[in-house]
Design a protein with these regions (language model features):
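Exposed, flexible binding/inhibitory loops of compact, secreted disulfide-stabilized domains
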Residues: 17-155
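Sec-dependent N-terminal signal peptides
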Residues: 4-12
Length: 155
């Protein structure tokens, strides 16, 4: 009887220790501002902002090219948070808290690795960049050879 009571007391604690919302972003790097800051967005196909998901040595390489961010990040920095919970990958890049500048700048590339995905499994990718902007989610199958490119303007 004591074992049953002990088991019933320990079971909820053990169930609460499952792996959820674990940070899994590694090697985050970015190129900084490309050229001068501006007060309006750039245009043209050569400036297309792309989000690329790529299989890399058992991990997911997430790369964003030509992202337009508030130029306050140059002084305050950027944060990248990634988590894998079940079949959902949440990936968030944002400027550190601080006063916003009255300008924007184009970041040629920012990239990091997301670990902990299972080969052959379908995932939903939830992406946000900058304060409060969430792109529509999409699904992908994590497998060798994966190279998925999304134009963020059409997401």
């Amino acid at each position: 009887m004591k074992k049953l009571v002990l088991l019933l007391l320990v079971l909820p604690i053990w169930a609460g220790c499952t792996k959820s919302e674990i940070s899994r972003s590694k090697e985050f790097a970015h190129t900084g501002c490309a050229g001068d800051a501006a007060t309006r967005a750039w245009g043209g196909d050569s400036d297309a902002s792309l989000l690329t998901l790529k299989y890399e040595d058992g991990n997911l390489r997430v790369t964003r090219t030509n992202a337009v961010l508030n130029c306050a990040f140059v002084q305050d920095g950027l944060i990248c948070e990634a988590s894998v919970e079940g079949n959902v990958v949440r990936y968030r890049v944002y400027e550190k808290e601080g006063p916003r500048a009255n300008c924007i700048c184009r970041v040629e590339e920012m990239s990091s690795l997301v670990t902990g995905l299972e080969v052959g499994k379908e995932y939903t990718f939830e992406y946000s960049c900058g304060f409060g902007y969430n792109y529509p989610s999409f699904t992908f199958v994590f497998k060798k050879g994966l190279r998925l490119i999304q134009n963020t303007a059409t997401m």
